[in-house]
Swiss-Prot record:
Annotated EC: 3.6.5.4
Gene Ontology terms describing biological process: SRP-dependent cotranslational protein targeting to membrane
Subunit structure: Part of the signal recognition particle protein translocation system, which is composed of SRP and FtsY. Archaeal SRP consists of a 7S RNA molecule of 300 nucleotides and two protein subunits: SRP54 and SRP19.
Alphabetical keyword list: Cytoplasm, GTP-binding, Hydrolase, Nucleotide-binding, Ribonucleoprotein, RNA-binding, Signal recognition particle
Recorded domain comment: Composed of three domains: the N-terminal N domain, which is responsible for interactions with the ribosome, the central G domain, which binds GTP, and the C-terminal M domain, which binds the RNA and the signal sequence of the RNC.
GO cellular component labels: signal recognition particle
SUPFAM superfamilies on file: Domain of the SRP/SRP receptor G-proteins, P-loop containing nucleoside triphosphate hydrolases, Signal peptide-binding domain
Binding sites annotated in the UniProt record for GTP: 106-113, 186-190, 244-247
Signal peptide: none
Protein name per UniProt: Signal recognition particle 54 kDa protein
Length: 433
């Protein structure tokens, strides 16, 4: 993935160097995005649609308050890349019956046999009893390769060194492992245009009725991954895909995008030669790594938290400011850090009405306030006026603070509530004009 990270790193350097995004700058950045995607071997039609979507969003969407345009552009780039590679949610591997039969297929040289062992170890580490079956009668070394890998990872193996009928070997192998949780059946590598071999894998499919058919694709084929997937799909259903050799090429991004275009789900990627260098594919995590941004999750949290604060602001503007709303504010503030952030979002610079001393005190006491609010009942959060001395003592005891700490928090809340009244009056005056 290093090569892929490097080419996207150059793109991010250009974006970070932008202070203001006007039409000319946006067009230049869009061309740079296109060049980057083409270097990653993403199919041209996907490059065009990706760029159009990203540019449209930047033009039409307003960044949340406090988020510089360049940061929001990176956020949009992240979201669109995740969509390009299959969506936010990773496709999980979940055996639904026993035994759960997995049929592996792919072209010769794709790393399919090694992948069979990698998948077996991945599942074994998660508590599944796994059996490996080798049906390749064309490549003599396949039998020894998978048997040795099976011994290395401690997984049972079935194969017939001198076997001639792949279909019969598959049937006997499945029968041999009928008490296993998962049976992984490896097949001979085949070219997508070799009709006889494609018919053979269809015959194996019909004979063992696999619960999942997994296509193994070499990342170095880039955008041609779509053609491979579509060729196999003509003969049997492809339920999921594993992309191998992701560590050795920048074209892996193109392979992932091309596969996503076919509708097949990438479930795993191979990121090295060792049997442990194998991981579940998550578009979100993959994009974060490719962009080389250790703080990407922080950036996403920041933007999402600001959106949450804007929802709180809507509640304030509508007059729905109670302690439950205040609690939502505290939750967002714990993500963002400084309390002054929420007041910066208020229109008309209402933050000036809160003293620096109050803000600094609030920053020191955020966690204490969160504990206090968590000690209140829902009725108390929605109806702060019922908080008498007895209730305050109970809340303080539950939060591990003194009653005066509860009263101090209520004072800050009351100040914010009064500000909301001022805000509503200003809004009504504007509407009356």
């Amino acid at each position: 993935m290093k090569a892929l990270t490097e080419i996207f790193g150059k793109l991010l350097e250009k974006i970070r160097g932008v202070d203001y995004i006007d039409e000319a700058t946006l067009q230049e950045l869009s061309r740079e995005i296109q060049r980057t995607l083409l270097k990653a071997d993403v199919p041209l039609d996907l490059v065009k649609s990706f760029t159009e979507n990203a540019v449209k969003r930047i033009k039409e969407e307003k960044p949340p308050a406090g988020i510089p345009p360049r940061e929001y552009l990176i956020y949009v780039l992240y979201e669109e890349l995740v969509k390009l590679l299959g969506g936010e949610q990773p496709a999980e591997f979940k055996p639904t019956k026993k035994p759960y039969i997995v049929l592996l297929l792919g072209v010769e040289g794709s790393g399919k046999t090694t992948t069979a062992a990698k998948l077996a170890k991945y599942l074994a580490k998660r508590g599944y009893k796994v059996g490996l079956v080798e049906t390749d009668t064309i490549r003599p070394a396949a039998f020894d390769q998978l048997r040795q890998l099976a011994e290395k990872i401690g997984v049972p193996f079935y194969g017939e060194r001198d076997g001639k009928d792949a279909v019969e070997i598959a049937k006997r192998g499945v029968q041999n492992f009928k008490n296993m949780d998962v049976i992984i059946v490896d097949t001979a590598g085949r070219h997508r245009n070799e009709e006889a071999l494609l018919k053979e894998v269809r015959a194996i499919y019909d004979a063992v009725s696999p619960d999942e058919v997994v296509l193994v694709i070499d990342a170095t084929v880039g955008k041609m991954a779509a053609a491979q997937a579509e060729a196999f799909m003509k003969y049997l259903p492809i339920h999921s895909v594993i992309i191998t050799k992701m560590d050795s090429t920048a074209r892996g991004g193109g392979a992932l995008a091309a596969v996503a275009k076919t509708g097949a789900k990438v479930k795993f990627i191979g990121v090295g030669e060792d049997v442990d260098e194998f991981e579940q594919f998550s578009p979100r995590k993959f994009v974060a790594r490719v962009l080389g941004m250790g703080d990407l999750d922080t950036l996403l949290e920041k933007i999402k938290a600001v959106f949450e604060e804007e929802e709180v602001l809507e509640e304030i503007e509508s007059g729905r400011l109670d302690l439950l709303t205040f609690k939502k504010q505290i939750d967002s503030l714990l993500k963002l850090g400084p309390l002054s952030k929420v007041f910066q979002l208020l229109p008309g610079n209402l933050a000036a009405k809160i003293s620096e001393e109050q803000i600094e005190l609030s920053q020191r006491n955020l966690k204490k306030w969160r504990a206090i609010l968590s000690s209140m009942t829902l009725e108390e959060l929605k109806n702060p006026e019922i908080l008498n001395a007895s209730r305050i003592r109970r809340i303080a005891l539950g939060a591990g603070v003194a009653p005066k700490d509860v009263k101090e928090m209520l004072t800050v809340y009351e100040n914010l509530r009064k500000m909301s009244k001022t805000l509503r009056r200003q809004l009504r005056l504007r509407m009356a004009k």
